[in-house]
Regions:
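Short, small-residue-rich loop/turn micro-motifs
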Residues: 41, 53, 91
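Membrane-interface loops
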Residues: 38-44
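Perimembrane loop-to-helix junctions flanking transmembrane segments
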Residues: 44-57
Length: 144
């Protein structure tokens, strides 16, 4: 019973949950990104895609595709995690506060959840089950 209230972390379980979180959120975001990628590749009219930054509809779509497809793919494998979540955080900030900013919370809820998860991953990093961990382990200086 006392263990329920313990604040000690189980590193193995924490690393496994970071992997599950990364893999799940990446796959979910890829679902959003694939549709945008298909729109971009098909040469369809992009004038309906929001342009909140004033850089053009096609450029805005391209930036969203980069974040939601490329960065999500890299996040899935845990490569440069803290770097690749930055475009995802930026995309979610734009989606939540600019694109859906005037709508009720229900329209902003999913983007807010993604934003919180990406902020968490920015702080924690990818965990042990990632390419980042493998690279860091190989390049980490030894203490003499």
């Amino acid at each position: 019973m006392i263990r329920i209230f313990s604040t000690a972390q189980n590193k193995g379980l924490t690393n496994m949950m970071l992997f599950i979180l990364r893999a799940t959120v990446s796959c979910f975001m890829l679902v959003h990104g694939i549709g945008k990628w298909q729109m971009l590749m098909s040469g369809a009219d992009t004038s309906q895609f929001p342009d909140p930054l004033g850089v053009g509809h096609s450029t805005s779509l391209g930036l969203a595709v980069f974040a939601e497809v490329v960065c999500s793919g890299l996040l899935f494998i845990g490569f440069a995690t803290r770097l690749v979540v930055v475009p995802l955080i930026f995309t979610m900030i734009i989606a939540v506060f600019v694109v859906h900013g005037s709508q009720d919370f229900a329209a902003r809820e999913l983007g807010s959840l993604y934003l919180i998860i990406y902020l968490l991953l920015l702080i924690t990093g990818s965990g042990k089950y990632s390419i980042d961990h493998f690279i860091y382990k190989k390049t980490k200086p030894t203490n003499y």
